[in-house]
Amino acid sequence: TKSSAASDVYKRQPEPFDYLKNKNDHNFDIELEVHLQTKEMNESCVISRTNYNYLYWNMAQQIAHHTITGCNLRTGDLLASGTISGPDKDSRGSMLEIAWGGKEPITLPNGEKRTFLEDGDVVTLKGFCKGKGYKIGFGNCIGEIKPSA
């Protein structure tokens, strides 16, 4: 439920504009994992763990900010948060951040190094909420990097 997944908002610096402040401000405690499996690996490994709560803007604020200039949202419009990165190196939310723009390669369990995704890599995104005695998963979002045509 909304109340069981709600959490305190991660500290925002600078503070949001007044029209984006809400006395009941909260975000959702949704754990997120990014898994990578290369063609050479038998199973995937976790390359990032972050949390939806690290978003600077919660979804209500994103909608308010989007629509304040008259740009309406309509049924069927897609609204997405973008990259969700946390405060630690292990919670960076994109490969660009994880490998720090290609300057800090990551070493995978089989010894391969990656600065960017390569053809044949499979990325799995997982999201879930946990409570006392239960875990609610959102399923897996899986994508494979294909060679350019």
Residues covered by each model-derived region:
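Single conserved hydrophobic/aromatic residue that forms the stacking wall/gate
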Residues: T1-A6, Y10
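Residues that flank catalytic or metal-binding motifs in active/ligand-binding sites
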Residues: F28-I30, G139
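Residue-level preference for beta-strand/loop junctions
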Residues: K2, H26-F28
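Short loop/turn segments at secondary-structure transitions that flank enzyme active sites
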Residues: S4, T38-E40, S85
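Active-site pocket scaffolds in enzymes
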Residues: W57-H65, T75, L79-F128, G133-E144
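Short conserved beta-strand and strand-loop elements enriched in small hydrophobics
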Residues: I30-Q37, D121-G127
